[in-house]
Amino acid sequence: MAYEEYLKDFLEISNITVGDTVKVTKPHIEHEGMLLEKPDYSNENTIILKLDSGYNIGIDIKDAKIEKISEGKKPQIELDPVDKKISDKKKNLSILSTGGTVASVIDYKTGAVHPAFTADDLLRATPELVDYANINAKAIFNILSENMTPEYWKKTATTIYDEINNGADGIIIAHGTDTMHYTASALSFMIDSPVPIVLTGAQRSSDRPSSDAFTNLMASVNAAKSDIAEVTICMHGTEDDSYCDLHRGTRARKMHTSRRDTFTSINMNPLARIENNKVTINDTQVKYTKRNEKELSLNTNLADKVALIKMYPGISPEIIDIYVDKNYDGIVIEGTGLGHCSDDVITSITRATSEDIPVVMTSQCLFGRTNMNVYSSGRRLLQNNVIGVGDMLPETAYTKLLWAAGQTDNVSEIYEIMKTNLKGEMDTTLSQNYFIKN
């Protein structure tokens, strides 16, 4: 990040630029080091120096004097090419980045950072990959996962489609963990694939000793070479590095803010465990799409506006009315218990369905399924053309309704799509063993 005008003026008075060695003097303090680029979101009055010790320090320029000691050049890293060991005997895998980098190269002596996402960067950080696959890597875009939108999902899906068409035997998506489960479920509905599509990420950055990035990436490579041709999420299965779980993309959810094993399969077990470079199916009775079972196809038609609304005590019916007034294409309700909402909002929900806005009911309990026949409030919703979607996750219902409403304007047809199990997102059987209580 460039320095603001105020700081630029402070530096230019002494003809100082990034890379120069400088001395900064304040009352009772003196520091000497190389001027670095300013990080994002740092204090507006702060300059950054790289000290001889290797540490970086931020200095507030208030009451400071600065002197150029020697002229330098902007830090950069000279990188040697990497031997990718391309072989016809290995599968071709495409690793696509949606935000940041899987492997940034940092020169701790100069402070320079090489953030470009290329196959060479990836293989420098994880050279073991060349023993397992021919790696092609590229950045699709560079955003924080909380800034993900349906338009980015479309671009990701189209890039995946092109990579498979160009000969990729498997796809790995590097993605921020916060909204990874939304993206996984959205891709599940937009793509039929003959090869595995695996999303992975890290809870701890790759420069930390406790990082999960390497283990997750290596496990994802094995998943992308496997026979499981679905959209999946591959992340740590435990807090240590013993194994990773492979979750169905429409059934996974981030369940902890910081644990490395944050992702959990809801209302089913993970499809597989990946341990010591081996992919083991957890339950042979669970059906999954196998490699080359489906022809490659892409359908990125999504509705423009679908809302996901959580029910809570005291919710105002105006919240529903706003989406109706703005002609939303659909509403997903995250209801209480078996799929309930307060009497106060039923009139507004009825207004939505009467104006041909499909309304779908899920449960904020996550585990278990909706059943709107048990209590009177649920039956009233059923009578007013609200449908329950069983054990489907709220986030999955949101992405599925976006896709369903993008296929047709007919509410009955949208409801039929929502009630049909397309990508393993819902099931008529449910084991109590899937409930996590510890």
From Swiss-Prot:
<dbReference type="GO" id="GO:0006520">
    <property type="term" value="P:amino acid metabolic process"/>
</dbReference>
<dbReference type="Pfam" id="PF00710">
    <property type="entry name" value="Asparaginase"/>
</dbReference>
<dbReference type="GO" id="GO:0006450">
    <property type="term" value="P:regulation of translational fidelity"/>
</dbReference>
<dbReference type="InterPro" id="IPR006033">
    <property type="entry name" value="AsnA_fam"/>
</dbReference>
<dbReference type="InterPro" id="IPR036152">
    <property type="entry name" value="Asp/glu_Ase-like_sf"/>
</dbReference>
<dbReference type="Pfam" id="PF18195">
    <property type="entry name" value="GatD_N"/>
</dbReference>
<dbReference type="InterPro" id="IPR027475">
    <property type="entry name" value="Asparaginase/glutaminase_AS2"/>
</dbReference>
<protein>
    <recommendedName>
        <fullName>Glutamyl-tRNA(Gln) amidotransferase subunit D</fullName>
        <ecNumber>6.3.5.-</ecNumber>
    </recommendedName>
</protein>
<keyword id="KW-0648">Protein biosynthesis</keyword>
<feature type="domain" description="Asparaginase/glutaminase">
    <location>
        <begin position="91"/>
        <end position="421"/>
    </location>
</feature>
<feature type="active site">
    <location>
        <position position="177"/>
    </location>
</feature>
<dbReference type="InterPro" id="IPR037222">
    <property type="entry name" value="GatD_N_sf"/>
</dbReference>
<dbReference type="InterPro" id="IPR027474">
    <property type="entry name" value="L-asparaginase_N"/>
</dbReference>
<comment type="subunit">
    <text>Heterodimer of GatD and GatE.</text>
</comment>
<comment type="function">
    <text>Allows the formation of correctly charged Gln-tRNA(Gln) through the transamidation of misacylated Glu-tRNA(Gln) in organisms which lack glutaminyl-tRNA synthetase. The reaction takes place in the presence of glutamine and ATP through an activated gamma-phospho-Glu-tRNA(Gln). The GatDE system is specific for glutamate and does not act on aspartate.</text>
</comment>
<dbReference type="GO" id="GO:0004067">
    <property type="term" value="F:asparaginase activity"/>
</dbReference>
<feature type="active site">
    <location>
        <position position="178"/>
    </location>
</feature>
<comment type="similarity">
    <text>Belongs to the asparaginase 1 family. GatD subfamily.</text>
</comment>
<keyword id="KW-0547">Nucleotide-binding</keyword>
<dbReference type="GO" id="GO:0005524">
    <property type="term" value="F:ATP binding"/>
</dbReference>
<keyword id="KW-0067">ATP-binding</keyword>
<dbReference type="GO" id="GO:0006412">
    <property type="term" value="P:translation"/>
</dbReference>
<feature type="active site">
    <location>
        <position position="254"/>
    </location>
</feature>
<dbReference type="GO" id="GO:0050567">
    <property type="term" value="F:glutaminyl-tRNA synthase (glutamine-hydrolyzing) activity"/>
</dbReference>
<dbReference type="InterPro" id="IPR040918">
    <property type="entry name" value="GatD_N"/>
</dbReference>
<dbReference type="InterPro" id="IPR037152">
    <property type="entry name" value="L-asparaginase_N_sf"/>
</dbReference>
<feature type="active site">
    <location>
        <position position="101"/>
    </location>
</feature>
<dbReference type="InterPro" id="IPR027473">
    <property type="entry name" value="L-asparaginase_C"/>
</dbReference>
<dbReference type="InterPro" id="IPR040919">
    <property type="entry name" value="Asparaginase_C"/>
</dbReference>
<keyword id="KW-0436">Ligase</keyword>
<dbReference type="InterPro" id="IPR011878">
    <property type="entry name" value="GatD"/>
</dbReference>
<dbReference type="Pfam" id="PF17763">
    <property type="entry name" value="Asparaginase_C"/>
</dbReference>
<dbReference type="InterPro" id="IPR006034">
    <property type="entry name" value="Asparaginase/glutaminase-like"/>
</dbReference>
